[in-house]
UniProtKB/Swiss-Prot annotation:
Gene3D superfamilies attached to this UniProt entry: 3.40.50.2020
The protein's assembly and partners: Homodimer.
GO cellular component: cytoplasm
Species for this entry: Nitrosomonas europaea (strain ATCC 19718 / CIP 103999 / KCTC 2705 / NBRC 14298)
Functional description taken from the UniProt entry: Catalyzes the transfer of a ribosyl phosphate group from 5-phosphoribose 1-diphosphate to orotate, leading to the formation of orotidine monophosphate (OMP).
Pfam family, one: Pribosyltran
CDD domains membership: PRTases_typeI (cd06223)
InterPro entries recorded: OPRT (IPR023031), Or_phspho_trans_dom (IPR004467), PRibTrfase_dom (IPR000836), PRTase-like (IPR029057)
Record's protein name: Orotate phosphoribosyltransferase
Length: 227
């Protein structure tokens, strides 16, 4: 695990984005932990979040021309990532979609730069792949090419098959998926925290029931991959 991944977990705990206890996922599964990126909800948090994503994107080595954030959570996310990348010397155009198509003014369903070239989709946590499919459809319709997906957390849970949800997306659309951190990273972090280590058995039990059974080839930042 890279230093910035370690710091990101610290950061997520500080803002209660990552919590441990008894929760239920969107899929209806009881879960011993919860990750809600919507709680990065002040100026400092949003700036830091963009910097973490930018570091992860650059560390992955993925080649892209522009960024795209699916509405609604992807709108502030893609904006802060674009700023962080520019501050690091990598200036890229960005855009996002409207949920409701505008029929006046500039019109259309895309706000920001025109979709062109290789487009990197950025999101928080992909649970069902719905926003990903919609984003890919929009990108193709504009004549651009989706070249990858960047998310904050890979829960490493099986989706509709024995593969993880992110692996299913990778297989379906034949594009790389990058995660800032994984459940493995969270567990490794917990092993270093005496005040939190007691949560590990519940997480391991959860993985026994819901963890992906097929080896994952998703690009977890800091690990080598071909993109």
């Amino acid at each position: 695990m890279s230093d910035f991944q370690w710091r990101f977990i610290d950061f997520a705990l500080q803002y209660d984005v990552l919590r441990f206890g008894n929760f239920r996922t969107k899929a209806g599964r009881p879960s011993p932990y919860f990750f809600n990126a919507g709680l990065f909800n002040d100026g400092f948090a949003l700036k830091q979040l963009g910097q973490f994503y930018a570091q992860a994107i650059l560390a992955s080595g993925i080649r892209f021309d522009a960024l795209f954030g699916p509405a609604y959570k992807g709108i502030p996310l893609v904006s802060t990532i674009a700023i962080a990348l520019a501050e690091a010397g990598h200036n890229h155009p960005f855009s996002f979609n409207r949920k409701e198509i505008k029929d006046h003014g500039e019109g259309g369903d895309i706000v920001g730069a025109p979709l062109a070239g290789r487009i990197l989709i950025v999101d928080d946590v992909v649970s069902a792949g719905l926003s990903v499919g919609e984003s890919i459809t929009l990108i193709h319709a504009a004549g651009a090419t989706p070249c990858g997906i960047m998310v904050a957390l890979d829960r490493m849970e099986k989706g509709k098959s024995e593969c993880s949800t992110l692996q299913e997306i990778k297989n379906k659309y034949d594009i790389p998926v990058i995660s800032l951190i994984t459940l493995d990273d969270i567990i490794a972090y917990l092993h270093t925290r005496q005040d939190l280590v007691h949560h590990i058995p519940a997480i391991e039990t959860y993985r026994t029931f819901y963890g992906a059974k097929v080896p994952d080839t998703v690009n977890h930042t800091g690990r080598s991959t071909s993109v």
